[in-house]
Amino acid sequence: MSIVKEQFFQRVEQHLHAIYQDVELPIAISELTEELITLILGDNPLRDPTPHTNRWDEQDVVLIAYGDSIINHEDSDLAVGTPLEAPLKTLHRFIKEQCDHQLNALHILPFYPYSSDEGFAVMNYAHVNEALGDWQDINAIAKDVKLMADLVINHCSSRSIWFENFLTDTHPGKDYFKTACLTDDLSQVVRPRTSPLLNTVTTTSGEKHVWCTFSHDQVDFDFENPEVLKEFVGIIRHYLDNGIRLFRLDAVAFLWKQLNTSCINLPQTHEVVRLLRTLIEHAEPSVVIITETNIPNQENLSYFGNANEAHAIYNFALPPLLLHTLLSGDSTALKHWMMSMPPAQNGTAYFNFIASHDGIGLRPIEGLLQPSEVASLVSTTMQFGGRVSMRTSHDGTHTPYELNIALFDALQGTHNGADKFGLERFLCAHAIMFAMEGIPGLYIHSLLGTTNDYERFDNSQHNRAINRHRWQESKLLAAIAEKYSHHHQVFNGVKQLLAVRKRQAAFHPNATQFTLHLGEGLFGFWRQSIDRQQSIFCIYNISSQPQSLTLADLNLINTQQWYELLSKTVLDEELKTMQLAPYQTLWLSNRA
């Protein structure tokens, strides 16, 4: 056995001992280790990963979309019925022909057969939903962009073959799902839904109560059974073989359940993430693991581990904080949060986003905003046509959990109501995200300036549907071509920001970041490239009033020429102050 393989074996074995230390296993840990290594490598050679390697740079921007976000359909007014081609082909063509090479990565939201929750109740992990396309379509996309896929690891569909086998006490699936007794004390369990946690089902061996963190159609796995772990390692190998290089671990914080605990962020959950990291990076070192943990900020940060868990974590506090900042015209909370965020170690990065297929989560800002500020966010969201999703707190009360609204509508005004600065405010939000430390993730409906889809909401009665519009391709192309439409202005404005961003070494996800103190109406930070050759001062007017910037407040080294990157202008050396229009952005750099 080579040194690399021996060390690999020992690390996997250590992870398994930590995970299953309180579980009586049917097989020896050493045997399980061998099986997992065989599954993850398949017919491929063992790789020796280099630790603390940044697998990203300033060129990386991830587009987030459903496989059928754009549909080629003969009816130009409706994105319904049978498409003229596989929607994955339509999405692929749109990226290649319309996005000017500004997007080099794509997160296709669950593209597997499913029974509910827009893909997150997976019926078969090994198949592509026939309504979207097939594995050939996935492979074709993976040849053009870095491809990100969801590993829906906490639960699967109640209509999956595994759960059907659970009901009939047959394999595989017989012991795959978490059960509990109605008499168990489950009062400490933390979850983001108001539905009953347990669902009673009838099996051939009698009545059982299965654990459902999210919905009764999404039944939680029991990872105390190592067969479940083996299934998922095999699934990961299958995805690797089909070109997936970024893995989003969906709802992973809830993975391990233990009575008399919160059943969230348990030590075994973190150890499973570390195990998957070890297995994957020895199979394909270029892979990036991103944990989707929509939880309070400090808990979210824990998924970095010691640079040995997730390569990247979602910056869940950013969307609600940035929304608060732009609706209130006050940068205080955003500034304090940014100052508190530790720089990501090499080999780790923040995954920044300000809109997604889900709503804008409120749990991540617990302790960051005052209750009155959260209440204002809820009120303004409703005023601008959005919806608010609730969760059940420990005391049984219902608490706002998520704001459901298209970002373009959410930023149509301030807490004082709608105004004329919606477009400027929207582009300012993206200019902030694109310049921050981390990898930017751009939701397709933010790229397109899509508004609230009330028809989709009315048809489904699911709050999240309001921000999950399906575009008909010809209608979309007409909208982004019409130069006076907000879709055209958003689409081209965002692409222009990205074109500038991708040329700046100081916007590397791991470049230095320092928060500036410029008063309530301005927000700013300084970025410096890893080689220390480029500095960029990123300044934003986050208010609806003009703001004055005193250049003496910045450390503009007077022996260097300074440039404003977005306007492509040279700063006058005699200039003392600059006036920023409402929601204007300045990127001041010592390199043009």
Language-model segments: residues:
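Active-site and adjacent substrate-binding regions of carbohydrate-active enzymes
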Residues: S2-A592
